UniProtKB/Swiss-Prot annotation:
A motif (Nudix box) lies at residues 159-180. Its cofactor is Mg(2+); Mn(2+); Zn(2+). The lineage of its organism: Bacteria, Pseudomonadati, Pseudomonadota, Gammaproteobacteria, Enterobacterales. InterPro entries: NAD-cap_RNA_hydrolase_NudC (IPR050241), NudC-like_C (IPR049734), NUDIX_hydrolase-like_dom_sf (IPR015797), NUDIX_hydrolase_CS (IPR020084), NUDIX_hydrolase_dom (IPR000086), RNA_Hydrolase_NudC (IPR022925), Znr_NADH_PPase (IPR015376). CDD domains: NUDIX_NADH_pyrophosphatase_Nudt13. Residues 125-248 form the Nudix hydrolase domain. It catalyses: a 5'-end NAD(+)-phospho-ribonucleoside in mRNA + H2O = a 5'-end phospho-adenosine-phospho-ribonucleoside in mRNA + beta-nicotinamide D-ribonucleotide + 2 H(+); NAD(+) + H2O = beta-nicotinamide D-ribonucleotide + AMP + 2 H(+); NADH + H2O = reduced beta-nicotinamide D-ribonucleotide + AMP + 2 H(+). Substrate binds at K25, R69, E111, Y124, Q192, P193, W194, P195, F196, P197, Q198, S199, A241. The gene is nudC. This is NAD-capped RNA hydrolase NudC.
Amino acid sequence: MDRIIEKLDHGWWVVSHEQKLWLPKGELPYGEAANFDLVGQRALQIGEWQGEPVWLIQQQRRHDMGSVRQVIDLDVGLFQLAGRGVQLAEFYRSHKYCGYCGHEMYPSKTEWAMLCSHCRERYYPQIAPCIIVAIRRDDSILLAQHTRHRNGVHTVLAGFVEVGETLEQAVAREVMEESGIKVKNLRYVTSQPWPFPQSLMTAFMAEYDSGDIVIDPKELLEANWYRYDDLPLLPPPGTVARRLIEDTVAMCRAEYE
């Protein structure tokens, strides 16, 4: 699937190593390979954006290596492709040897997979399913400040799905563990690949059922009900959390204005 990049090759360039992304001038490189000193590198086409190929090159650059978070303001489709590249680069880097027999592996020519040359085991990129949920109580939404976000941003609750658990069960468990309340009338909204490092966010809306807020201090700094027209600092646009909050606000406006 990969090939050597030639002088006239062009497109978007995802140059990644150890979950970092090359961002010269703070931007995702776009243009001819020669302009970025990429001729002769091995590259894998991982998609297209607006008719232009998106290439993945697994390489460490001396300067301008940053986080994929820095390009979160890109168009959603291009951000997702950049995230795909970072995740694939880390997958190939971390699967050089078979976890069963220890022998060297090689990339498949037909799909994103690594194959063992000895025991024939096949490995695919790992995806960690997560739930994220906006909880409404009359004209208010439950928002929390997470311990990992000490920048004042308040957001909705989220967490990883556990082994042997449905998405619906994960919502109920995470909400109870983090906030101490029960929810009802769960409704699926959308999903979003989230490369931090390899999550797939499944987004829901729910209604408050019962209970008082009792936070898990290992997860949350604080949580509270906020009226739809008096909200704290929110996650940036383009995130699924922001969409859930805005959808909830729209529902409240329609009902209370």
